[in-house]
Amino acid sequence: MVASHTVKLIQALEGDAAAIRKLTREAYAKWVPVIGREPKPMTEDYTEAIKKHRFDFLYVNGELAALIETIRCSDHLLIENVAVSPSFQGKGYGRMLMAHADKLAASSNFEQVKLYTNKLLVENVRLYIRLGYSVNREGAVVSGIKGTSLRGA
């Protein structure tokens, strides 16, 4: 018997910064030993970011499971952050959020969606490539971090 899940996507509001921070810190904690420091999303000021960027929450059976942060640029949509709660990872919710970003881009007449990630987050890079993204460039970005820039059509 397959369990049914109620999945809702809701745009976050300015008062949701604490929930964004909590979920993001939980989601990225596993990467601290891999890269030797907290990934950039763990250190962001979400009280300020939510005023400038779009955040969408994904709820599963009423529980906050994941979020995506996007930024409308002049010619593309930038995915700034995708965070999935550890208890919901590996269940396709990150893919759902990536598909949501594609819809947001299309509704803004953008032909591209871009994102940046630390190349040491290998399982994330593999997921993005499976979703149709291609590596645009690699190199040191902010603070000497080895980054990977990906773009999707």
For the regions a protein language model found, what residue spans apply to each?
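Acetyl-CoA-dependent GNAT
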Residues: V2, Q11-N81, S85-S87, R95-L104, ...
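C-terminal "cap" of GNAT-fold acetyltransferases
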Residues: E44-T47, F55-D56, E111-L131, R137-A153
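Generic structural signal for residues in well-ordered beta-strands
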Residues: V7-L9
